[in-house]
Amino acid sequence: MSAIKKGITLVALSLAGCVSQSPQFAVPDVIRFGQDTFVKVTHSQIDEMQHLLYLPEKSEKNPENWQKGILFFLDKNSKNQTLEQRAAFRQASFAKKPELEAKVEIQQNELHSSVIYPPTERFNNVMLEVTRGRNLACGYGQIQFADKREVGKTLAKKSPNLTAYSQEIAKLSLELNQLGWQVQCSK
């Protein structure tokens, strides 16, 4: 009987070791992007999802009111979603919002998107957002850069021509693609 207990204990310990050895996300505390240095301001987690916000070092670092930011979305991906599934979901979501300009594609095993959001009643700015995402050993990691561009209240109500921002979003997308990959997995 004691041999059975020892065997069960050994199996339980080895399984516990496997669980504790699963890879975890590792991200930097500071990111250099464009002309700015961004520092981690918030880190929240809900179930398997983590959300981190980095704001320029030379800013108020107010997570409720910022103009430029880098966001990380980290998902353990227990549902094993492919990049194609994530791309289809985004395209379907963006299709429901005809007022924005969006592009989603997969390039070299990365999910890329660029979105131009129009001003709203609450926010009088146009937001340019570019993202890169990868499936990793520890889950799905996504890096997003968002830049809010002020527009006057009068222009915000007139629904500005978002295609006027096409060159700027293409430039931001190129800069984000040139940024070294920032999400790693560690044990």
What are the residue ranges of the model-derived segments?
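Sec/Tat-exported extracytoplasmic proteins
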Residues: 42, 94-98, 173-176, 180
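N-terminal export/targeting and maturation segments
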Residues: 23-66
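Bacterial signal peptide processing site
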Residues: 19-21
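Short, exposed beta-strand/loop patches in secreted or surface proteins that constitute
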Residues: 30, 43, 100-106, 133
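Sec-dependent signal peptide recognition
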Residues: 2-10
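Conserved polar/disulfide-associated segments of primarily extracytoplasmic proteins
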Residues: 58-123
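Short, well-structured beta-strand
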Residues: 115-187
